[in-house]
């Protein structure tokens, strides 16, 4: 049986769970509480040298990185199909998921989440929070996150993150003009990969960002209607995190809206 090291509210772990649900694949739950730092322990780093979730285990094979996991599952368990039949369609799908790896995840969605909500978890922990931050292997990622934890929405990284999210939503709105899904008439790994990012905006009470993008709003409603949404996302929602995100998101919506106006 497959096994997944994951976290309930991790965007990247959510992607993997959606894919597993769409494929109807059973898997062993190996949930990690990230705020306890278990993912930074040596035993886990042997599985995932970047000390992030998710990590998929398939027999004696270890597959890290969420987008790599999606493609592995598609190749290894091809039914039901979640990629276009033609090479050009597959290339378009990969261009979408490539954005997540390049900057949308770390430099936009994660920064918005930390700048609004998660920074308070680190600040409340004081020295322990700083020690956890120091454990992030990537220097640039660590210092960018440190800045946004210290300054919140006043960090320039936060401003850039919101602007990048606006750009992404505009690109999605344009792509959805000619067909119902991001890469044509069929639901693919591109839709799997981006669904958690709209859910994160919902959790942060920032769905106002899609108010003037009706095609994106409709796409998200259709993603929510799929059985995988309840199975892989709603079922795993952590009420403590939801309360923090919604309360803080509502407080900072005026700042986000102001950044959007100047984007």
Task: Report the location of each language-model feature.
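Long, positively charged, glycine-interspersed low-complexity recognition regions
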Residues: 212, 217-263
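GST-like domain detector, emphasizing the conserved glutathione-binding G-site
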Residues: 1-139, 152, 250, 257-263
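GST-like fold's C-terminal all-alpha helical module
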Residues: 102-221, 225
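Short, solvent-exposed turn/loop segments enriched in Gly/Ser/Thr/Pro and often Arg
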Residues: 7, 33, 189, 236-237
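A generic structural-conservation signal
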Residues: 29, 53, 185, 210, ...
């Amino acid at each position: 049986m497959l096994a997944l090291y994951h976290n309930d509210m991790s965007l990247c772990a959510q992607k993997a769970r959606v894919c597993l649900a769409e494929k109807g694949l059973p898997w062993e739950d190996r949930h990690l509480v990230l705020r306890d730092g278990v993912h930074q322990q040596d035993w886990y780093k042997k599985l995932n040298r970047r000390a992030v979730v998710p990590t998929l285990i398939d027999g004696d094979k270890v597959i890290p990185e969420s987008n790599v996991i999606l493609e592995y599952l598609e190749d290894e368990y091809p039914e039901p199909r979640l990629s276009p039949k033609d090479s050009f369609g597959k290339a378009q799908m990969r261009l979408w998921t490539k954005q997540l790896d390049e900057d949308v995840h770390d430099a936009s969605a994660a920064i918005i989440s930390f700048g609004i909500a998660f920074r308070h978890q680190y600040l409340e922990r004081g020295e322990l929070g700083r020690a956890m931050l120091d454990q992030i292997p990537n220097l640039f990622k660590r210092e960018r996150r440190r800045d946004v934890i210290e300054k919140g929405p006043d960090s320039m990284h936060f401003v850039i993150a919101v602007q990048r999210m606006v750009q992404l939503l505009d690109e999605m709105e344009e792509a959805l003009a000619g067909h119902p899904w991001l890469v044509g008439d069929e639901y693919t790994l591109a839709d799997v990969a981006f669904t958690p990012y709209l859910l994160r905006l919902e959790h942060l009470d920032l769905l106002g960002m899609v108010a003037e993008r009706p095609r994106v709003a409709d796409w998200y409603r259709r993603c929510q209607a799929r059985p995988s949404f309840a199975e892989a996302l709603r079922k795993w929602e952590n009420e403590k995190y939801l309360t923090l995100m919604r309360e803080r998101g509502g407080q900072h919506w005026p700042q986000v809206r102001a950044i959007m106006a100047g984007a």
